[in-house]
């Protein structure tokens, strides 16, 4: 299942690390955050290496919808109310500057990545009052926003908040252009970190500073990020023979659609849900909406993405923990990774090189006063539910009762396992306990994967780890029907 970006951009293969490497800074993760941070640190004169578990852009960067905007849903009214105007202004300023810095780099360096300056729209079906509050908040924080009762959308809406001068682009074309300037080891997963030493399957990296930019920090202690975040999945479809008015569109309601265009196609996305809580049907819903909104359109690609959602409501960017002052982190972008990645690169570079940044406070992972105890308690409750379901209760079907293409808990060879029936004769079976912290995995019928509802790790039908925080594969087997 390749995204429209993966179908239209292939980067060169880079060798893995063998032996030892040394650097001033080691960056874990070769996505947008890791590559931008590594490049900015290198431009400040530091020696930097990047360790990437798969390949550059092979994680969430290649599965984004790539809206480069400081408008992140209806966030600003809530930030002002919860954190105060000063910190809300920090968030707005950091992301507004991120959009401009990213566009300036593309234009000055002549990077061919289909950059298009356009407006961003937050719409609602019937919540005009919420839109008016958000427009007022955005303007108060210095953003060029306005409430518009009429929008160009092919939807019945009550209006939209228009933020002028934002951008959209091809994320992988941009990323590969930057990656060519860096020292990157692909197929080099970091398995363990001790101080400034990174341990990988075939070697080690020694560094004075370590940046965790791997989407979800895989280190449980210190930091306890697994207790302060959850992950969500969402789904996208690229449509040919469809026309969208200029702009990027994002709905206020949970069931609203997100839309943008790319080179004659329209990207329609939505269907967000907590990872591991998927009853299926999300691609079917997208296809139904596509024909209603764009009759006669044709599907060019479909894919899904995963996002880290923080309890605090803003990303965690800064020092990883007080216990390890040489570690830094950027995570929890809450679906807005393009601008937040650029903001993180600027902020982390300043912290490492200068010791401070004027907008660091709003992103500080260690600011406990900024956390939301109720949300953290909810994350703990969700994890407790998953841990409490380690053992299957009640009867489960026999593996041969599953239809071809169907998966779920089933009995195979006298043992209860997670079983996927690939053909009439072949079954793939995995243990249903997540190797991260032991939560019971759930079947994802849309992506045909085993997903953890506690912290969001995912595995394919053969047990191979797809997303962190888990770092190891599942015990698995393949059986043929006798």
Question: What is each residue range found by the language model?
Answer:
Residues 23-50:
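N-terminal Rossmann-like FAD-binding beta1-loop-alpha1 element of flavoenzymes
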Residues 136-138, 160-208:
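Helical element adjacent to the flavin cofactor pocket in flavoenzyme catalytic cores
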Residues 193-261, 400:
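Flavin-dependent oxidoreductases
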Residues 237, 409-482:
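Rieske [2Fe-2S] iron-sulfur-binding domain
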Residues 253-254, 278, 283-285, 294-380, ...:
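C-terminal catalytic lobe of FAD-dependent flavoproteins
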């Amino acid at each position: 299942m390749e995204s429209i970006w993966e179908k239209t951009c292939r980067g060169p293969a880079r060798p893995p690390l063998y032996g030892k490497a040394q650097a001033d800074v080691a960056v874990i993760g070769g996505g947008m955050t890791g590559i931008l941070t590594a490049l900015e640190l290198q431009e400040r004169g530091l020696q930097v290496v990047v360790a990437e578990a798969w390949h550059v852009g092979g994680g969430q960067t290649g599965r984004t919808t790539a809206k480069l905007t400081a408008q992140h849903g209806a966030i600003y009214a809530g930030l002002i109310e919860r954190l105060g105007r000063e910190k809300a202004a920090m968030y707005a300023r950091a992301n507004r500057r991120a959009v401009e810095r990213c566009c300036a780099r593309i234009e000055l360096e002549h990077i061919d990545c289909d950059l298009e300056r356009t407006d961003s729209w937050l719409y609602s079906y019937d919540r005009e009052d919420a839109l008016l509050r958000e427009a007022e908040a955005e303007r108060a924080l210095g953003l060029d926003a306005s409430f518009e009762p009429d929008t160009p959308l092919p939807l019945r809406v009550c209006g939209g908040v228009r933020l002028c001068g934002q951008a959209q682009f091809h994320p992988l074309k941009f990323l590969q252009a930057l990656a060519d300037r860096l020292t990157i080891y692909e197929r080099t997963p970091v398995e363990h970190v001790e101080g400034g030493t990174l341990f990988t399957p075939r070697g080690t990296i020694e560094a004075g500073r370590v940046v965790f930019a791997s989407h979800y920090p895989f280190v449980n202690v210190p930091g306890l990020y697994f207790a302060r975040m959850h992950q969500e999945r969402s789904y996208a479809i690229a449509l040919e023979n469809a026309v969208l008015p200029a702009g990027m569109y994002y709905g206020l309601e949970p069931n609203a659609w997100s839309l943008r265009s790319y080179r004659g196609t329209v990207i329609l996305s939505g269907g967000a849900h907590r990872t591991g809580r998927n009853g299926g049907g999300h691609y079917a819903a997208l296809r139904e909406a596509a024909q209603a909104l764009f009759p006669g359109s044709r599907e060019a690609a479909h894919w899904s993405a995963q996002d880290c959602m923080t309890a605090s409501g803003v990303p965690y960017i800064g020092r990883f923990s007080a216990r390890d002052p040489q570690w830094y982190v950027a995570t929890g972008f809450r679906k807005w990774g393009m601008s937040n990645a650029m903001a993180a690169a600027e902020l982390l570079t300043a912290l490492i090189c200068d010791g401070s940044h004027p907008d660091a406070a709003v992103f500080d992972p260690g600011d406990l006063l900024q956390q939301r105890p109720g949300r953290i308690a909810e994350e703990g409750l969700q994890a407790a539910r998953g841990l409490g379901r380690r053992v299957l209760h009640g009867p489960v079907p026999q593996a041969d009762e599953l239809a071809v293409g169907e998966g779920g808990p089933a009995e195979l060879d006298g043992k209860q396992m997670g079983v996927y029936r690939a053909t009439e004769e072949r079954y793939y079976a995995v243990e249903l306990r997540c190797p991260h912290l032991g939560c019971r995995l759930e079947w994802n019928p849309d992506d045909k994967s085993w997903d953890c509802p506690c912290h969001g790790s995912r595995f394919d039908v053969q047990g191979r780890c797809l997303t962190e925080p888990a770092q190891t594969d599942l015990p698995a087997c393949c059986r043929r029907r006798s």
